[in-house]
């Protein structure tokens, strides 16, 4: 018994020793914290320049303004951020230090505070990177709603000013969404009356309720500032650039007028450069950081809105070391015609700049030079050389660059000069070209050489086209070729009041038109063409050359004997003329509205008469050529007319059914929209039907109308109305409604070997055929019957064009024999019988069956011995055994819990030992 007691005593003493070790550890930890210097638990700037430091203990002595140093973005005590006062209550001795600055700190600034002269320790406390808030909410103010942008840092103050709700470390702050769901729940830091709240994780467009100490005091509505930082090729050179390119970003936001701070960071997150610009609402603002070294790549740009502190970052921008720049021609030989604008494409690599030279002062007695800049960064610059103005006008009229690229420092020289545009242009022939990367005008060793070949110009052809009177052709009509076959048809007979389009195929015109449009007073291609081309009536027969040498006259030739020519006066017909140019194909379309043209004698085209016209385009002897080049086209304008198609009895016949067609033909331009008016002469069946029709390319038109609601035997009149829908220009014809052709058909489900189907019955009022469609009424026609006479038919066998090898749906459809040849000619002729506007049909499933083949019985029978081994798979009934969860021992954390476990284990061991001894 004594041994037992001694064992218990020893175990108990051991337990006390173990417990004392843990207890000592706990006591030592607390003692170490208590012995530390005073430190900052939380720091915040709020309420227009007020700073709070929540400390973990008293400063030991009152903090004065002279004890505080302010660092803004690393600058110590800037003059406009001085400490104006220290709160008399919260002076540090209470564990809270509050003081005011001369100026509010913007949320994008870095704020650090150093407090010196404290009692004990190292006498100093430092708060770095203090939370600078953009707005302050008073928990006891009940001021209502606060609007904030997502990403702002807000200060929620509970300082007991009115409701005695001074915050403590147990004061709860709760933020709930509009549905009452808690999104944030926290407590104030000890010795702090300010809770800093980040709105980054809140949803835009939502309203949130803020409660402090159980009271709902404030609502916050979250909006989106939409601060975007984009890498844009239009403002810089993109996301993958070299050290010669420009690193720039576009910044936009929904709210403008406020400054923003853009900082460029390198791969080590070190600041490289900073810019401040005022943002514009929904407009891009460019932050340009110029050229950057490849050594610190990649870079990114962080932009912070100064007022709210909301930030956004760009994607990564990679900068590589640039290679030596090089320039070349896309094609080493470029050719065009004298008077045209030559497009020369220069390609640049590892550079934005290049210098181009065209011609040689010694060999050609002419040269022009320009400095190119690839502003859009696509590696190409298209140079336009106007051979019409070369050697005469200012340099900029000769060399130009379209689009976003640029050309500067143009210099033209050589012995070749022109006093005016009436002087001779450059001679046809080959001219040297070269291009060199860089900006130096002194080129001794060009990167690439090439040849510009200028050929003689010519007038190849002029032909006429007809377009509807309302064709609305304009000078930006880039799709004029798409009109061909729709509302533009080649013709030398044009209906009066329609538009006649003169297609001129000629080279050497482009330069004169571009000069008038770019450097003259012309606002569009039409004005440029009229300005560059002599169309003056009284000078048409003048043998003297005009300034440009270009001439167009349209002369009336049917004026009779002993009469002067009567040309169109384009100067008084400007509203009637539209020009569409296609210089790439040396083609120019001059559209003239025949309803508006005025002749030299002041008269217009009489629409009731035929007028014969001769259009001639020429390049006269002058600056562009030494010889006259021309071509002419003769055409006639005729009275507008339309003729309706009649049956053998001289009337327009339609059936009392839907989808009835009335046809005719006209001389107005294809594509014109006409109307066919059909008006009843019966009081019992009154109607007026006006379907619209489009004139086809062959001059025909087809009007479709529904007569199924009107009785057979009704008479009506029919006439064609012009484009305006009022004036009729066809004779009024008689029309009659007759009985509609009718048909019925029936087919049943059946089995077939796939070669034929059987239609149960059909009734055809005018005879015809039964066609079989596969699948549905619009499916392929797979077979048709022989001709069936008018009347009823039963058990009609239709042989299929190709045998069917699988089941299908057969759709039986009666067709007419519209051309009377008793042969099935659909499509084209032999339309289906219809009812209510739809084809008459019936359908049934056809099952494909194969003929049974009888095979001779196999006389040899193989008998397999029974398998003596039987494998049985016995599915035993599933028994649900309880799964054994292997318990996982989780180490408890905390010194108190560990000590208790150890003590319990020792006591249990002691009791077990006693039991064994007993």
Curated annotation (Swiss-Prot):
Location within or outside the cell: Secreted, Cell wall, S-layer; Cell membrane
Chief localisation class: secreted
Keywords annotated in UniProt: Cell membrane, Cell wall, Cell wall biogenesis/degradation, Glycoprotein, Lipoprotein, Membrane, S-layer, Secreted, Signal, Transmembrane, Transmembrane helix
Biased composition (Polar residues): 833-846
GO cellular component: extracellular region; plasma membrane; S-layer
Transmembrane segments annotated in the record for this chain: 894-914
InterPro entries in the record: DUF7827 (IPR057149), PGF_CTERM (IPR026371), Slg1/2_DUF7282 (IPR055706), Surf_glycop_sig_pep (IPR026452)
Glycosylation sites per record: 37, 56, 110, 219, 250, 261, 291, 306, 318, 343, 392, 434, 487, 541, 555, 572, 585, 614, 715, 776, 836, 845
Disordered as annotated region, ranges: 815-894
Protein name: Cell surface glycoprotein 1
Source organism (scientific name): Haloarcula hispanica (strain ATCC 33960 / DSM 4426 / JCM 8911 / NBRC 102182 / NCIMB 2187 / VKM B-1755)
Classification lineage: Archaea, Methanobacteriati, Methanobacteriota, Stenosarchaea group, Halobacteria
């Amino acid at each position: 018994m004594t041994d037992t007691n001694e064992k218990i005593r020893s175990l108990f003493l051991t337990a006390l020793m173990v417990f004392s070790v843990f207890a000592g550890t706990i006591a030592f930890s607390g003692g170490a914290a208590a012995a530390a210097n005073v430190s900052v638990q939380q720091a915040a700037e709020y309420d227009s320049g007020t700073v709070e430091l929540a400390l973990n203990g008293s400063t030991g002595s009152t903090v004065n303004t002279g004890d505080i140093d302010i660092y803004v973005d690393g600058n110590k005590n800037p003059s406009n951020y001085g400490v104006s006062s220290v709160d008399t209550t919260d002076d540090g001795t209470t564990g809270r230090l509050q003081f005011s600055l001369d100026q509010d700190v913007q949320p994008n600034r870095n704020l650090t505070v150093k407090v010196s002269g404290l009692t004990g320790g190292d006498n100093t406390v430092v708060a770095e990177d203090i939370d600078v808030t953009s707005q302050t909410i008073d928990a006891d103010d009940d001021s209502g709603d606060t609007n904030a942008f997502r990403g702002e840092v807000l200060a929620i103050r509970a300082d007991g000013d009115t409701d005695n709700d001074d915050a403590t470390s147990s004061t709860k702050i709760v933020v709930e969404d509009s549905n009452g769901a808690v999104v944030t729940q926290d407590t104030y830091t000890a010795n702090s009356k300010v809770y800093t709240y980040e709105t980054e994780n809140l949803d835009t467009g939502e309203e949130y309720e803020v409660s402090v100490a159980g009271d709902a005091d404030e609502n916050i509505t979250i909006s989106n500032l939409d601060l975007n930082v984009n890498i844009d090729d239009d403002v810089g050179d993109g996301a993958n650039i070299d050290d010669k390119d420009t690193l720039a970003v576009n910044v936009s936001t929904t709210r403008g007028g406020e400054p923003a701070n853009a900082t460029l960071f390198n791969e080590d997150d070190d600041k490289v450069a900073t810019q401040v610009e005022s943002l514009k609402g929904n407009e891009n603002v460019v932050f340009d950081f110029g050229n950057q070294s490849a050594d610190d790549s990649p870079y990114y740009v962080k932009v912070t809105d100064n007022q709210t502190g909301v930030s956004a970052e760009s994607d990564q921008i990679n900068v590589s070391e640039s290679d030596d720049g090089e320039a070349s021609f896309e094609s080493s030989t470029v050719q065009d015609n004298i008077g045209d604008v030559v497009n020369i494409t220069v390609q640049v690599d590892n550079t934005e700049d290049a210098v181009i030279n065209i011609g040689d002062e010694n060999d050609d007695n002419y040269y022009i030079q320009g400095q190119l800049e690839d502003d859009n960064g696509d590696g190409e610059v298209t140079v336009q050389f106007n051979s019409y103005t070369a050697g005469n006008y200012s340099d900029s009229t000769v060399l130009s660059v379209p689009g976003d690229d640029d050309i500067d420092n143009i210099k033209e020289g050589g012995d070749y000069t022109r006093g005016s545009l009436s002087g001779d242009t450059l001679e046809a022939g080959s001219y040297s070209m070269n291009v060199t990367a860089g900006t130096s005008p002194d080129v001794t060793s060009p990167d690439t050489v090439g040849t510009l070949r200028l050929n003689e110009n010519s007038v190849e052809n002029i032909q006429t086209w007809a377009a509807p009177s309302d064709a609305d052709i304009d000078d930006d009509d880039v799709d004029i070729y798409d009109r061909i076959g729709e509302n533009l048809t080649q013709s030398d007979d044009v209906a009066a009041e329609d538009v006649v389009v003169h297609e001129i195929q000629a080279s050497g015109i482009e330069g004169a038109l571009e000069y008038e449009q770019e450097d003259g007073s012309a606002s569009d291609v039409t004005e440029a063409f009229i300005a560059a081309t002599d169309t003056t009536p009284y000078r048409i027969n003048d043998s003297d050359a005009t300034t440009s040498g270009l001439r167009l006259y349209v002369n009336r030739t049917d004026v009779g004997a002993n009469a002067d020519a009567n040309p169109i006066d384009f100067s008084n017909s400007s509203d009637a003329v539209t020009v569409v140019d296609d210089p790439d194909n040396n083609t120019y379309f001059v559209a003239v509205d025949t309803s508006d043209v005025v002749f030299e004698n002041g008269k217009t085209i009489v629409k009731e008469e035929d007028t014969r016209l001769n259009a001639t385009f020429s390049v006269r002897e002058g600056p562009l050529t030494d010889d006259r080049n021309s071509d002419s086209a003769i055409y006639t304008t005729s009275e507008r007319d339309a003729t309706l198609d009649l049956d053998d009895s001289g009337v327009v016949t339609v059936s009392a059914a839907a989808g009835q067609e009335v046809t005719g033909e006209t001389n107005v331009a294809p594509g014109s929209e006409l109307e066919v008016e059909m008006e009843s002469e019966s009081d019992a069946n009154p109607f007026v039907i006006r379907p619209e029709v489009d004139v086809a390319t062959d001059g025909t038109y087809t009007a479709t109308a529904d007569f199924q609601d009107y009785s057979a035997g009704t008479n009506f009149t029919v006439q064609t109305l012009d484009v305006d829908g009022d004036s009729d220009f066809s004779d009024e014809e008689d029309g009659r409604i007759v009985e509609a052709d009718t048909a019925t058909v029936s087919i049943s489900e059946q089995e077939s070997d796939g070669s034929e189907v059987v239609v149960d019955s059909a009734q055809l009022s005018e005879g015809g055929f039964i066609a079989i469609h596969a699948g549905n009424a619009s499916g392929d026609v797979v077979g048709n019957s022989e001709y069936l006479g008018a009347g009823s038919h039963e058990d009609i066998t239709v042989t299929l064009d190709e045998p069917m090898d699988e089941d299908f749906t057969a759709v039986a459809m009666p067709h007419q024999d519209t051309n009377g040849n008793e042969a099935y000619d659909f499509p084209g002729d032999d339309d289906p019988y219809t009812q209510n506007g739809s084809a008459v049909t019936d359908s049934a499933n056809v099952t494909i069956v194969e003929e049974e083949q009888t095979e001779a019985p196999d006389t040899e029978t193989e008998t397999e011995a029974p398998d003596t081994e039987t494998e049985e798979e016995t599915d035993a009934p599933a028994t649900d055994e309880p799964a054994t969860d292997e318990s996982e021992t989780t180490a408890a954390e905390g010194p108190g819990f560990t000590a208790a476990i150890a003590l319990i284990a020792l006591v249990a061991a002691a009791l077990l030992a006693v039991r064994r001894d007993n």
